[in-house]
Design a protein with these regions (language model features):
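Sec/Tat-exported extracytoplasmic proteins
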Residues: 47, 61-68, 81, 88-92, ...
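Soluble metallo-hydrolase cores and metallopeptidase-like ectodomains found primarily
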Residues: 37-39, 114-154, 219-281
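Extracellular/luminal Protease-associated
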Residues: 123-229
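Bacterial N-terminal signal peptides that target proteins for export
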Residues: 2-14
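Extracytoplasmic/secreted proteins, especially bacterial periplasmic and envelope-associated proteins
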Residues: 35-42, 52-55, 59, 76, ...
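Noncatalytic luminal/extracellular "stalk/propeptide" segments of secretory-pathway proteins
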Residues: 29-32, 58, 62-173
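N-terminal capping segment at the start of a domain
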Residues: 36-71, 213-218
Length: 281
């Protein structure tokens, strides 16, 4: 048996810890069954039926709270994770130094359809750049995906705010598949839109819920392409913008974002080691 390292980051904490607790519970037996399939099934069964992990998740979410990389809450989560892991039967638990992105949301974002009093529910996408201090006001062009942007081209995209409005496919039983079918608008959409001259991007939140709470995640800017502000609208706010565009194709949107990316911040992976019987080194 070789040495096993289990690395817990707060981003993957829940799923990793399910496996961790299950593995350590089963690993305490003197002799494991040689039938790997049986052992794997036992691990999954333990993961799916144990309530311990949910208690830990409850503490992580409700006692420690948000854990954006580089934040004080993320540091608290690291210390808590090390403490929790030290209670299990690892041979060694330690922290590994690393640096993580340090993005700050800043003052609350504002988005409003020109001519309407009620603001839209909006949040900047993680790692987005900010708008100018006074915000941006521009015409909105609605698209259903990245392909639409490429078809429309620079002539119709330049100087506008691109509204990626493809919804999550509610017909798909697998929510993961539904999410995957729409998330490219968030991750790649802003850079694609910027390539064709867009000055900002708003997206319909990627998710299955019908509410007005924006779902963010991160966007990934491509090298060599200008970074433009990118934000997520709550589903109901996206519906409002969609309806406004049906009534008037020349709708203008005001958006103001105050986010900033600072130098990478120090953080840690938390690592647990189980030494093998045959090859402990």
């Amino acid at each position: 048996m070789k040495k096993i390292k289990i690395i817990i980051s707060t981003k993957l904490f829940f799923s990793s810890l399910i496996f961790l607790i299950s593995f350590l519970t089963l690993a305490q037996r003197d002799k494991l069954d040689v039938n790997d399939t049986k052992i794997i099934k036992e691990i999954f069964d333990e993961s799916l039926t144990s309530r311990e992990t949910y208690k830990l998740l409850d503490h992580l979410c409700n006692k420690i709270g948000h854990r954006l990389s580089g934040s004080s809450s993320a540091s608290k989560a690291v210390e808590w994770t090390e403490m929790i892991m030290s209670k299990y039967n690892f041979d060694k638990v330690y922290k590994q130094n690393l640096y993580v992105p340090n993005w700050k949301r800043g003052e609350p974002e504002v988005a409003k359809i020109i001519g309407q009093k009620k603001e839209l529910s909006v949040l900047a996408l993680g790692m987005s750049v900010s708008t100018p201090k006074k915000g941006i006001t521009a015409e909105v062009i609605e698209v259903q995906g990245i392909e639409d942007v490429e078809v429309l081209g620079r002539e119709k995209i330049k100087g506008k705010i691109v509204f990626f409005n493809r919804p999550t496919d509610q017909r798909l039983i697998s929510t993961g598949s539904a999410y995957g079918g729409a998330v490219d608008q968030r991750t790649s959409g802003p850079s694609i839109a910027a390539k064709y001259g867009a000055i900002a991007v708003v997206i319909r939140s990627v998710g299955t819920a019908f509410d007005d709470v924006p779902h963010t995640g991160v966007t990934r800017y491509k090298e060599g392409i200008k970074k433009i502000p990118a934000a997520a609208l709550g589903v109901k706010s996206a519906d409002r913008l969609e309806l406004a565009l049906k009534d008037n194709a020349n709708v203008k949107l005001f958006i103001k974002m105050n986010c900033i990316t600072l130098e990478d911040a120090p953080s840690h992976n938390v690592i647990g080691e189980l030494m093998g019987n045959e090859f402990p080194d």
